[in-house]
């Protein structure tokens, strides 16, 4: 399997409970390296751009409001098969359906407040990473 990069967001429901370290420990335990990380407060424009694919969905406004409600931690993760590996570590979007040992099973409050985001494909990972990081901020 090839070394690849993926994008992660630790969402406001997790940062408000000071879970960044616990989530990072699960990421690293899975064999992924955190090669870039910063804590930010996402602007409305950033959130609307990031989630533009959901603009026509009824939950779009609530999602944007949630993502700007508090700090988030944006990250670039690197490793063999990083995209699928991180999606496995995150667990199902619905925490009640997430497997034991996953981030969402351990920390998510609900489907809406599910603690983390991860890219779903190499193309989206590249776009998402570029939205939040300059090349010199990613140090592998």
UniProtKB/Swiss-Prot annotation:
It is an enzyme of class 2 (transferase). Keywords: ATP-binding, Cytoplasm, Kinase, Magnesium, Metal-binding, Nucleotide metabolism, Nucleotide-binding, Phosphoprotein, Transferase. The active site is at 117 (pros-phosphohistidine intermediate). GO terms for molecular function: ATP binding; metal ion binding; nucleoside diphosphate kinase activity. Coiled coil: none annotated. Its main location: cytoplasm. ATP binds at residues 11, 59, 87, 93, 104, 114. It is found in: Cytoplasm. GO terms for cellular component: cytoplasm. It catalyses: a 2'-deoxyribonucleoside 5'-diphosphate + ATP = a 2'-deoxyribonucleoside 5'-triphosphate + ADP; a ribonucleoside 5'-diphosphate + ATP = a ribonucleoside 5'-triphosphate + ADP. Its EC number is 2.7.4.6. One of its GO terms (biological process) is UTP biosynthetic process. PROSITE patterns: NDPK, NDPK_LIKE. Its cofactor is Mg(2+). It comes from the Bacteria. CDD domains: NDPk_I (cd04413). PANTHER family: NUCLEOSIDE DIPHOSPHATE KINASE, NUCLEOSIDE DIPHOSPHATE KINASE DDB_G0292928-RELATED. Major role in the synthesis of nucleoside triphosphates other than ATP. The ATP gamma phosphate is transferred to the NDP beta phosphate via a ping-pong mechanism, using a phosphorylated active-site intermediate. Homotetramer. Belongs to the NDK family. This is Nucleoside diphosphate kinase. The gene is ndk.
């Amino acid at each position: 399997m090839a070394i690849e990069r993926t994008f992660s967001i630790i969402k406001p429901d997790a940062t408000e409970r000071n879970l960044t370290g616990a989530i990072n420990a699960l990421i690293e335990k899975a064999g992924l390296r955190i090669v870039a990380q910063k804590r930010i407060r996402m602007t409305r424009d950033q959130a609307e751009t990031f989630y533009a694919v959901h603009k026509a969905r009824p939950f779009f406004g609530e999602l944007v409001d949630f993502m700007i409600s508090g700090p988030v931690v944006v990250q670039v993760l690197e490793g063999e098969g990083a995209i699928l590996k991180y999606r496995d570590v995150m667990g199902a979007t619905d925490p009640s359906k997430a497997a034991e040992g996953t981030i969402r099973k351990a920390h998510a409050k609900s489907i809406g407040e599910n603690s983390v985001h991860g890219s779903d494909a190499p193309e989206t990972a590249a776009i998402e990473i570029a939205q939040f990081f300059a090349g010199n901020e990613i140090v592998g």
